[in-house]
Amino acid sequence: MKKHFFLLLIIIISSCSPKNNFQLNGDIKGLKKGTVILAKSINGVEVTLDSINLNGSSKFSLNTFLTEPEVLKLKLTKSGTYNDEIEFFGNIGITNFKTNLKRFSYESNFEGSKQQEKLDDFNTMLNRFKEENLNFIKTQIEFSGNQEKLDIINRELINLKKREMYFIINFSINNNDSEISPYVAGKFLKDTNQKYLDTIYNSLSKKIKDSKYGVLLKEIKEFKN
């Protein structure tokens, strides 16, 4: 009788557990052996959602349960240490991932999430700002003995930072019906002027305001008050 009771209890618990509704199918060309980990941050603590040990195959499949679109982390370990990791926007359904072992982050490609498509566009533009910034730094070194030239470069650097900030603001407002908007604003604009955060938050649709990143953005802007 007791045995039947515990068996019934296990069945009930299993039936109440959320079913996996997100699947990441991946292929890391060149990988022969290693561990691939799917993780996310919960209240600042990284939690492993799923993992798989690979030995002789570069392909894998990882699964978890999502309540809404959110940023996940894919990590690769070899010889017991973390070697590479990349963040991406996961959504309910199937996401396909491809990359090269030697250029894990640089050649990564995610398909299946509309939020990730927008994040890819955002990162492409952000990388252009980073390249411009590096070019200015190289020029600063080149003209380190020319104060007049350095003053000009410094002004251009300030303008570059402003252009980058306004790009992020406009991107957030233009994508106000996507979780990407409060995520980007909360990550890159938390130290900016309060009025910009208010403008972005007020532009969000109700669904996005109630999302994980909408709630976080609200907390960030209220903390600044």
What are these regions (language model features)?
Residues F6-L8:
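Sec-dependent N-terminal signal peptides
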Residues I12-S15:
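C-terminal motif of bacterial Sec signal peptides marking the signal peptidase cleavage site
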Residues K190, G214-N225:
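TPR/TPR-like alpha-solenoid helical repeat scaffolds
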Residues S17-K102:
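Start-of-domain marker
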Residues M1-H4:
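Positively charged n-region of N-terminal signal peptides that target proteins for export
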Residues L66-V71, T77-S211:
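Preference for long, solvent-exposed alpha-helical segments and helix-linker "stalks"
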